[in-house]
Amino acid sequence: MILYLVRHGVAIDRADPKAPAEAQRQLTAEGIRKTRQAALGFRECGAKPDALITSPYVRAAQTAEIFAEALGFPLDKIRVSEALKPAENPADILRELSHARAKEVACFGHAPHLDLTIAHLAGTRAPFSELKKAGVVCFEQSARGKWELRWLLSPKLLRKLND
């Protein structure tokens, strides 16, 4: 299996007095634009996920929809998983993935949860990365079940791939 972990795009700042509840914060107009460009760059990487799974939080779901549109993935096939919420245990999404029949899966979530998931997949407890908003990391699972880091691309690099 190939696993892509995607952090949501730039959202309304939680410190903004007009910001809605945490789960309802949306992408900003700039966040939508930059996420769309990053999604097109992701497509240029040759990624062809046959499953998209998102956190139920609005900003992650919006990011998943933007990536789905760039990839030609049906919006109604995006799955929602509580295991991708910010405070969840990284092992929970991996258990869920173990039942997936997909060859390539893209999961959309949040920091620090995704950084903890990256560390977990790499076999360490302490996070060693900081996935940027609309950034993507790719892991591949070996025949023996070990996860191997293939690449990590910042949103800036993803956007350049589409230039």
Task: List PLM regions with ranges.
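Active-site-proximal alpha-helix that buttresses catalytic centers in soluble enzyme cores
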Residues: 2-84, 88-91, 114, 127-134
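Short aromatic-enriched loop/helix-cap "lid" or pocket-rim segments at secondary-structure transitions
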Residues: 15-19, 92-93, 151, 161-163
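Short, well-ordered coil/turn elements that cap or connect secondary structure elements
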Residues: 73-75, 102, 144
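A polyampholytic, Gly/Pro-enriched intrinsically disordered region
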Residues: 96-106, 148-156
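Non-DNA-binding regulatory cores of transcription-related proteins
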Residues: 99-106, 111-135
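Domain-level recognition of soluble alpha/beta enzyme cores
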Residues: 122-150, 155-160
